[in-house]
Amino acid sequence: MGNDRSLALVQGAVGGVLAGIGIAHGGLLWMAPALALLWSACRFPVAASLWGFVAVLLSHRWLLALHPLTWVGVPAPLSVPVAASIWLFCGAAAAVLVGLWAWLGTSIAHLATREAGIRAQLSHALLMASIWGLAEVLLAGSPLFWIGVGGSLLPGDRALAGLARWFGAGGLATLQLLIGWWLWRTALAWRRGVGWRRSLLVGLLCLLLAHGFGWSLLRSSDATAPISVAAWQPAIPTRSKFSEEQQRRLPEALQNALDRADDLDAAWLVAPEGLLPPDAVLLRPAPLPLLSGGFRWLRGQQRSALLVVDRGERQASAFIDKHRLVPLGEWLPALPGGVFRGLSAVGGLQPGAASRLLQWPGPTAAVAICYELSNGAALAQAVADGAQWLLAVANLDPYPLALQRQFIALAQLRSIETARDLLSVANTGPSALVLATGKQQQLLAPFTEGVGLADLHFHQGISGYTRWREAPLIGLMLFAVVGLGLSRVRSWLISLMLC
């Protein structure tokens, strides 16, 4: 028993390392063996917890770039402990969730699949995989989630990720859990020397068919002729963004970006999250429409928003407020005396409406402001309500390139889910165009200032995921429950007959 537990802990740790690499860099080659090790280790929930802890610590290690935090009022001696505590908290939260999932799986297995055949075991795997997939979707609507197993296929395996066109990120997570289960069961069959060749061949055939089906779903034929849209990447260091010098330079820099976009014959210019201060007024009338991140006041409450300045105007006339705020960074109320306002310069913001639909004089858009990109269901709802394209604005400074890679992976996933082009514009990057097929085109190099031009297509069709959302995944879970129930009844009847 002790050796078995030790082996499970090793499997959990190694699997967590592979999963962390897979989430950080994308690709089934990392995640599939990681999930196979999770299935093997989850007979001990503590080992499964270790898997989640290590996976998140590795994939979210960019959180340590929060240090130094002295610029938001954190005393210098506390800067490293605070940043490390946030990082460790995220790992601990993942450990609890994965541990609970493993405990639930072992409990269900004990009740329903003890001494059961392959059908019951497959039903159990379907149930646990679909529970994981639905859990990721639910967590994506909460403030404590960034990227999970569902987003780990990209950018490495766009063909298999094409299945998100029908099943979304939750479906991709479920599929990868099932691939991991297949690898684990095949490895067990190989150790016994019975049936492993058949298991391997059947699994590889299914995997090949899934890739082919996913690739076929990426085809898009309803795109309009492209429109040139400009993106401004100001590359302003966040830690000095609110200094007097930067605030003096910003209005003229923005005006210059508008002029450059106009010279490029762009239809409009997009600027990143948090650029404009409340009640901002342009130095001169805008030569073309401006969509820029910024702040605004509403009934004494400050909100982060995407602001729209029409051609010929100097102030915003339309907006959409940020709904999903960053924990500690944005929605932590100011403490007495203003000593600590949260881990950003704009602590104490209030959330806006949940809808991500922006209606303005241009083509209707589904908008994600930074952290909101992880919530695919909200963007799919906006597309169902009429959005023709997706817009993601962000400020990922001071975080390193690792976070930018994850941001683009999520952008690709959102484009595939909704069959819409996505324009990403961020302070230091990534500034890129992601086509409805999930293919990305970098507009500007990371951490450099510039104005890039994107040929944006608009789409009218509705994807399967936009139409059905999580209904297929819920149906799969119910199918698995029925399968387990029938296996239990069959086992009970056999026991009665033997008596």
Swiss-Prot record:
Q: What is its EC number?
A: 2.3.1.269
Tell me the keywords, alphabetical order.
Answer: Acyltransferase, Cell inner membrane, Cell membrane, Membrane, Transferase, Transmembrane, Transmembrane helix
Which pathway does this chain act in? Protein modification; lipoprotein biosynthesis (N-acyl transfer)
* Top-level enzyme category: transferase
UniProt key word Kinase: no
Would I find Transcription among this entry's keywords? no
> Which compartments does it reside in?
Cell inner membrane
Q: Which InterPro entries does the UniProt entry name for this protein? A: Apolipo_AcylTrfase (IPR004563), C-N_Hydrolase (IPR003010), C-N_Hydrolase_sf (IPR036526)
- State a single Gene Ontology molecular function: N-acyltransferase activity
Span of domain CN hydrolase: 232-458
Give the protein family.
Belongs to the CN hydrolase family. Apolipoprotein N-acyltransferase subfamily.
Record's protein name: Apolipoprotein N-acyltransferase
